[in-house]
From Swiss-Prot:
The reaction(s) this protein catalyses: orotidine 5'-phosphate + H(+) = UMP + CO2
Protein name: Orotidine 5'-phosphate decarboxylase
Positions annotated as active site in the UniProt record: 73
Superkingdom assignment: Bacteria
């Protein structure tokens, strides 16, 4: 895989690293952000922080120069999902996502909502199977497919609906690149440098392994946010990825 910048005109980095900002406190989050360089990563804002601090928090991160992945995983009736995705585009985020399990009509409505934004539209990504889920979790929901097979089915639907890519586990990346092509972007949580604790992720991989597997954007949280020197940790990860590319 070649390390390339996003097609978004807002992109300020060609690093595939997206740091997950999982903080309970706004000041703690901004204190961390002020220690790192927007040229070394993008930032992911999820449900907790967005619910606590709202769009203004996203704007504060953007004012510091960061591209933002708004990880709210919209899953609703088509009209509501479309309006939510358009609101994310109005906020100027770099990437936004929905749940593929919302179905084709919901995903098509979301994609169509971004057409007026042209080249300024955020990347539109769908979540397939959460990386915390195992086969037993899917069985509880009445899904008899393995996590990998179910994720591939949802990814195929996502591509059919015209999305830019999917969130998937790194283990699915090789297969997905073969099936869906190089332009279909793969966003992968559960990426942890060698020696990091697995935390609540079940299907994990190192950054170097993820790059080799074809992952386009790798989400890394606590190994960076809890690092004594997060700026150096990011530089070390990016350097290792450049060596592996």
């Amino acid at each position: 895989m070649t390390l390339t910048a996003s097609s978004s005109s807002r992109a300020v980095t060609n690093s595939p690293v997206v740091v997950a900002l999982d903080y309970h406190n706004r000041d703690d989050a901004l204190s961390f952000v002020d220690k790192i360089d927007p040229r070394d990563c993008r930032l992911k804002v999820g449900k907790e922080m967005f619910t606590l601090f709202g769009p203004q928090f996203v704007r504060e991160l953007q004012q510091r120069g960061f591209d933002i992945f708004l990880d709210l995983k919209f899953h609703d009736i088509p009209n509501t999902a479309a309006h939510a995705v358009a609101a994310a585009a109005d906020l100027g985020v770099w990437m936004v996502n929905v749940h593929a399990s919302g179905g084709a009509r919901m995903m098509t409505a979301a994609r169509e909502a971004l057409v007026p934004y042209g080249k300024d539209a955020p990347l539109l990504i769908a979540v397939t199977v959460l990386t915390s889920m195992e086969a037993s979790d899917l069985a509880d929901l009445g899904v008899t497919l393995s996590p990998a097979d179910y994720a591939e089915r949802l990814a195929a639907l996502t591509q059919k609906c015209g999305f830019d890519g999917v969130v998937c586990s790194a283990q699915e990346a090789v297969r997905f690149k073969q099936v869906f092509g190089q332009e279909f972007k793969l966003v992968t949580p559960g990426i942890r440098p060698q020696g990091s604790d697995a935390g609540d992720q079940r299907r994990i991989m190192t950054p170097e392994q993820a790059l080799a597997a074809g992952v386009d954007y790798m989400v890394i949280g606590r190994p960076v946010t809890q690092s004594v020197d997060p700026a150096q940790t990011l530089k070390a990860i990016n350097a290792s990825l450049q060596r592996s590319a």
